[in-house]
Amino acid sequence: MKLGFVSAILPEQTLAEVVGFAADTGFDCVELMCWPKGKAERRYAGVTHVDVTDFSQTEADEILQCVSDGGITISGLGYYPNPLTPNATEAAIYSEHLKNLILAAERLSVDIVNTFIGRDQTRTIDENWERFKQVWKPLIQFAADHGIRIGIENCPMFFTEDEWPAGQNLAYCPEVWERMFEEIPSPNFGLNFDPSHFIWLQMDYLKPLVTFADRIFHVHAKDVRLDRAKLDEVGILATPLSYHTPKLPGLGDVNWGSFFSVLSDTGYEGAVCVEVEDRAYEETLEMRQRSLQQSHIFLRQFTG
């Protein structure tokens, strides 16, 4: 396994600075954020360490030289919008930018693009399904044609009132994954698995490692702390951030020893990338860098 981090937590740093920090800390790889340049739509979005618009082979070669000089690799390219938003104009922009990521990944010889399926949060899964097929069948075929695998993160994208009532990502649970992969059985369609979401959803985060072993292309290492006393007060219908807190790996409720024990048993040899969303470490660049250093020390015991 390779240990890396998601570059979104270092938005003010250049690609060269991110690579240098990763190398100095001892990371093996980085998932590079590729949002379109412009105002961020939400926290951790809007970060552009690789601008994939009109991306040339010359640009790709420069990036590859940069990461090679640092002695690391690119685990994947990341972009996490809502391709199934009911706003047709926005949805078209998101899908087109995903195609740009796929083409950039091909030029970079990076075989994974990580993203969300998306969702119209006001509609049921069944009501979203036709849009899912319309948007994602051609996207997965486009990725396959260019030798790229798509890793869908299992975050429900339901944290606050503006994402009520159902969140903005269909692909949050195994039942939906089964249905997705039956609908689009392409070997280029899989998961970017984050166990932390299953903690606050109160689901088994180990079983999917086995059940979907052949579909797990990439892993995010994030932790959460569930506030049971608060959950007892507000119940599961409250907005989820009212009863759980994102934390660094090792500071929440994920049993990382068990997680890596099962993950390694499946034969997984891909990237495990730290995703920092812990507000206790976000105030300054130095604190965010320290959060990555701390996470590296903790997780390296499991990845070797």
Regions found by a protein language model. Name each.
Residues 33-62, 123:
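Glycine-rich, proline-tolerant flexible connector loops at the mouths of alpha/beta enzymes
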Residues 62, 66-73, 83-190, 200:
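Active-site acidic/histidine proton-transfer and metal-coordination neighborhood
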Residues 34-41, 83, 120-122, 157-159, ...:
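Conserved radical SAM core fold
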Residues 41-45, 87-89, 125-127, 163-165, ...:
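Short secondary-structure transition/capping segments
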Residues 1-4, 75-85, 238-239:
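N-terminal small/glycine-rich loop or linker at the start of catalytic domains
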Residues 1-29, 34-36, 68, 109, ...:
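Histidine-acidic metal/acid-base catalytic patches
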Residues 28-34, 73-78, 113-115:
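Short, well-structured secondary-structure segments
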Residues 79, 116-118, 153-155, 195, ...:
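Short, well-ordered beta-to-alpha junction loops that form the rim of enzyme active sites
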